Amino acid sequence: MKVIFATIWLIAGAWSQSAEQLGCIWYGQSHMIGAHWVNKGDTNPARPLNSPTSEAIFAKRCPMLYKEYKGESGEDELSLCCDAAQIETMESGLSQADGVFSRCPTCTRNMALTVCAMTCAKNHTLFLTAYNDTNDAGVDYVKYIDYRLTDDTVSKIYNSCIGIQHTQTGRPAMDLGCGSYNAKTCNYRRWYEFMGDVSGDYVPFQINYKWSEDAEEGSNEIYLDLSPLKCGESYEDSYACACIDCEESCPLTDAPTGPDELWKIAGLYGVTFILALIIACALSFFIFWGAFGKTSAPSVCMPTLFGEFFYHGFRIWGTFCAKHPVIVLALCSWAIAGLSFGIRYMTITTDPVELWAGEESQTRIEKDYFDQHFGPFYRTNQMFVKAVNQTYFTHETSNGVLNFGPAFEYNFLKEVFELQDSIMKLGMADNEGLDKICYAPVLMAGETPTVDRCAIQSVYGYFQHDMDRFENSYVDSNNYTINYLNQLEDCLRVPMMEDCFGTFGGPIEPGIAVGGMPKVAVGEDPDYMLATGLVLTFLGRNYNDESKLEPNMKWEKLFVDFLRDYKSDRLDIAYMAERSIQDAIVELSEGEVSTVVISYVVMFVYVAIALGHIRSCRGFLRESRIMLAIGGIVIVLASVVCSLGFWGYLDVTTTMLAIEVIPFLVLAVGVDNIFIMVHTYQRLDHSKFKTTHEAIGEAIGQVGPSILQTAGSEMACFAIGCISDMPAVKTFAMYAAIAILLDFLLQITAFVALMAIDEKRYLDGRLDMLCCVKSGGKKINDEDGDGVDRPKEVGLLETLFKNFYSPFLLSKPVKVSVLLIFTVITCLSLMVTPSIEKGLDQEMSMPKNSHVVKYFRYMVDLLAMGAPVYWVLKPGLNYSEPLQQNLICGGVECNNNSLSVQLYTQAQYPEITSLARPASSWLDDYIDWLAISDCCKYNVTTGGFCSSNSKSEDCLPCERGFTENGLRPDAETFNKYIPYFLFDLPDAECAKAGRASYADAVIYTIDDVGMSTVQDSYFMQYSTTSTTSEEFYSQLREVRRISGEINAMFKENNVDAEIFAYCVFYIYYEQYLTIWGDAMFSLGMSLVAIFLVTLLITGLDITSTFIVLFMVICILINMLGMMWAWSINLNAISLVNLVVCVGIGVEFVAHIVRSFKRAEGTAQERARHSLNVTGSSVLSGITLTKFAGIVVLGFSNSQIFQVFYFRMYLGIVLIGAAHGLILLPVLLSLLGPPQKLARSSGAEPTASITITTN
């Protein structure tokens, strides 16, 4: 193939073409077609340009041609194939391109090469062929031309421009500049063919590009061949493109690596794996050594210093309360009444932010800062709509067969659009419509929004909410059907085309409007045409002042009610309004009342039956203790009410969840103490006591210390829970701690008094609940003080323990097996503990039947775009100073580590940083906007602002000044026109105008002379889709790392500025960044608290204390293993439950250890005795009571109840019982001392805690 290339900047003398070859194809302009001038056909040679203004434009836009034509001396006559008017038209066209591509000077200079050659080069006929026509005045004009270019030239120009970013949207500029193609589907030919297509709005006549690679063999046609520079290179007196727009200009930096990978063995955390293995091997060795060796077990002594102090104190106190029950009850009732009155001051919150984010947490501080300066994030009302018929289909076009997903089936789309029309009309009849509450960013200042101007993200916007346009269909000349699918193809591929803008004046993001496409790599755009569902988003204004939100709340309720009642055979809808989560929290609380009440009733019935010792149906009402059980439960609930009142006085906000769960928790704990006190009293040898109140005092003396130990441990653990920064958890812990304290105080006072009254009723032969009626049986009470002839009571459960369970458990083979099994299970639990996932599934916080649960599920399937991240830059910069501008901007001459460049660089690694696009930059767009002469306008009459598209004669271009290099506005210009930029709406001429994107992003003040000073501002950046807790907290961790690096850059440059990243979701996930550290601290502090409480209550008995501590640690480790096995995540709720586990674990251990300490005989005998007497009580009084109430929670409608209360509390009970009733007796039988340390008293030494059952 013979192709002749022409290089236009070779000096004219080097060309040997004839004069005819060097002629023009046009000169001057003939007339306008539409908004564009067309050129006169003219084949004469080039003519001199006699307009200094136009010559200056030509010199600026076409410097190479200018230098060539002016000669080396610069004095040659400038002869061109264009006149002054054509140069001005060329300038106008290039200015439009500047609005998109001006961020990269090399790109615009490269583009100008071919435009200048086409418009003015004096050798037109070498590479242009004109096709003329005659207008009505008989003047020849050029109708269209053939423009012959080499592929290499245009490819280089295209490559220099392909990386340019449109900073307002974070998209490539080529998305706006390649017609129906986006940056990924565009190429150099498609780009130039779009710029030559007369059917567009920007081309005055058709330009048919002829490509050198398509030239026929042997052709003598000449193709214009130029040498454009790469984007990283610069022309003389110009600049190379910046890093954001040109990868070649970016400095070499290390890619972010994310968090360090943990060392793992077999998928488990290596450190705990090896540690558990070592412990397992060591313990197994000692177990076998002890089992088969001849050495006897070590003798462990348990000395005490003041163990009797608590016994005597509680005995005296119990005796006093039993002797004066009326006074005690009166005083307690007054205290209860006084504290309960505080409930009237109690406040309950359902605000998710108030529930899950502490006021001093970093994300809460950042959220409050953002809300106060820029206003709170929009109120989002959103729908996900799936097609019931999930059938894919095709559509034939001139470009081939297109594949479409079920979301674009005609009847489905039509119904969705009709549904959207109905939603947009909600409330309009009552003047409470969407237009009253919606967010409308593209409005002139003072303009009142209409529904059409509301920001609604929906594919219906691609048809401008016009059903006729959607239904329009016809067959083109090639017999292809042109319908709504063609429009969808164009708009899904290039949403930045003006024909695809929504009625509100902005683009519809495909990633926000459609979903369910096949998965692609992170950072890649999916094939939107294969969507299986649609997303409709209605944005509402939000306010810090909640009183202004009433119209929003009304419309959102209309939205929810309408969609709840909407039925369709084609549409499967999930929806959520901004208010839905708060409504769901209220619904959750109200819905769980029945579950909680049933749980309480079950425990009450159990207590009422088990508390008495019923021997026959005839003596039921005498031997039952229903009234005592009711009194005990009332005391427990009174302690909860008093706790609510106590914190109400102190104005501590609480939640419905706390109000529902705390009574259950305190009831489970309090009922244990009821059993312990009653049955300890029943097991006494009453003949050794002169009066009933002395016997009761003795019972309280025996069990009081252990009750104090367990209550103190639980209260201390809840107090540790108050350290949590999460309000819902903190207030739960605070209320529970006081409730347990008050419950303890009321039980050792009021309940003791009730025991005395009930015992007097029993001894007098009166019936339970009918105390005025006496039974026909013998009266037991002995008024002469010679003792009370009441039989000792031994229950069935204790008998079973004594005759069967204890001998079996404490046999040598079983003890060895128990130790081995618990060693293996505990070590396995330790191995898997670090593998527990952090987080809280969003669905769990909602009722199962809530519409929000379905919304969360559909969000995982259909959401293709993440939430916006706002990089908030606090005051401290002088933006009018170029050196400080360079720290922020991303354009020419900006620092390579500037804020914008760093955010751009991080967005190149979305799989790590979760940043999907480069950030918008108001500063870059403002500088670009000022650089275009016709964008900034002012009114010469008023001196005020004029919009850039104003055609008024009173509106003239702003008087602007620039720095010496011409790149930046001077300080006066910069400060003067910031309000103009933020008031100006973008259009084709001034795409960088800032009102739509930045009206809320820049906070500024204006001084007396009209100069603006920027204070706070933000830079918005879209994130990748995040739906799990791990994705959200990983993103938060990364943006904090990035903001830290940017702040470090500010410090290096001695700038007192600070930046932070804000996203509306971060506030819920901050806890997971430190959850393991918080867990270790809280659990460690809880264990320390238990150690100190136990050491004190046991009279500084170090051995007993360590045994209790060791057992509680084992319970905790196995609880963590259960969490891993049962898929319970670690979060603030489960952490508090673990702290509760530590506290309640003491109950399963402390009573048995105390009983062992007081018993007589060898370690084996004492272990068997403590298991028979106290172990049976632990099973019936602690384990079964909690189990009865917990099982009911399994039927809860709340997943939080099911997972974090049913599963975890069930685990606490079962694991605690297993350790207390299986492992502990075995350990005590091996480690217990041979000597007797029991205290002698009037009571039977071995009498302890038991619950009798028949």
Curated annotation (Swiss-Prot):
Stretches of the chain found on the membrane's Cytoplasmic side: 294-325, 615-625, 679-736, 837-857, 1101-1105, 1154-1174, 1229-1254
Keywords per UniProt: Cell membrane, Cholesterol metabolism, Disulfide bond, Glycoprotein, Lipid metabolism, Lipid transport, Membrane, Signal, Steroid metabolism, Sterol metabolism, Transmembrane, Transmembrane helix, Transport
Signal peptide span: 1-16
Reaction equation(s) it catalyzes: cholesterol(in) = cholesterol(out)
Membrane topology: Multi-pass membrane protein
GO terms, molecular function: cholesterol binding; lipid transporter activity
Extracellular side: 17-272, 347-593, 647-657, 758-815, 879-1079, 1127-1132, 1196-1207
Description of the deletion phenotype: Larval lethal at the second instar stage. In larvae dietary cholesterol absorption is impaired. In the larval midgut there is a severe reduction in cholesterol and failure to accumulate cholesterol-rich trafficking organelles. No effect on total cholesterol content, possibly due to maternal contributions. Glucose absorption in the midgut is not affected.
Tissue: Expressed in the midgut.
GO cellular component terms, semicolon-separated: membrane; plasma membrane
Function field: Important for cholesterol absorption at the midgut epithelium. Acts only in the early steps of sterol absorption, prior to Npc1a-dependent intracellular sterol trafficking.
Protein name from the UniProt record: NPC intracellular cholesterol transporter 1 homolog 1b
Gene of this entry: Npc1b
